[in-house]
C-alpha cells in the first residue's frame, strides 16, 4: 500500500533536486525520495545494530601502488580478516593508481571496523564503506 505525503522545499533546493533526478533517470520525484529514504534506513541499520547481526558492505579504495608498502598494508588487513572478505576486485586505473573493491560479510561491528581500517590506511587517496542490504526491513 502506498501513502501520499506532502513536503515543503525551497525553490532552489527543488530545482537542484529535479535536475539531479533527471540526470539519474528517475521517472518521478517519489521514486527518488523513496531511494533516499531507503539509503538513510540502511545507514541507520548499520550504525545502530547491536553488532551481532550479519551485515554485508562494499569497500572502495583508490591508491597509488608505488606508495611505500601501502599495497602490503592493505593486503595484510585483508588477510587478518580473511573470513570477512567475500570477494576482491583489483583494477589498474592508470600506470600508478589502483582501484580495489571488496565485498565484506560478517558481524556488523566487524565489517564496519575492517572497512574503516582499510579506508583510514595512510596513503589511500579515496575510500568509502557502503552498507548493503537485501531490503527485508525496508518495506
From Swiss-Prot:
Ni(2+) binds at residues 79, 90, 92, 98. One of its GO terms (molecular function) is DNA binding. InterPro entries: Acetolactate_synth/TF_NikR_C, ACT-like_dom_sf, Arc_rbn_hlx_hlx, CopG, CopG/NikR_regulator, Ni_resp_reg_NikR, Ribbon_hlx_hlx, TF_NikR_Ni-bd_C. Its cofactor is Ni(2+). Keywords: DNA-binding, Metal-binding, Nickel, Transcription, Transcription regulation. Binds 1 nickel ion per subunit. GO terms for biological process: response to nickel cation. Transmembrane segments: none annotated. Transcriptional regulator. PANTHER family: NICKEL-RESPONSIVE REGULATOR. NCBIfam families: PRK00630.1, PRK01002.1, PRK02967.1, PRK04460.1. Belongs to the transcriptional regulatory CopG/NikR family. This is Putative nickel-responsive regulator.
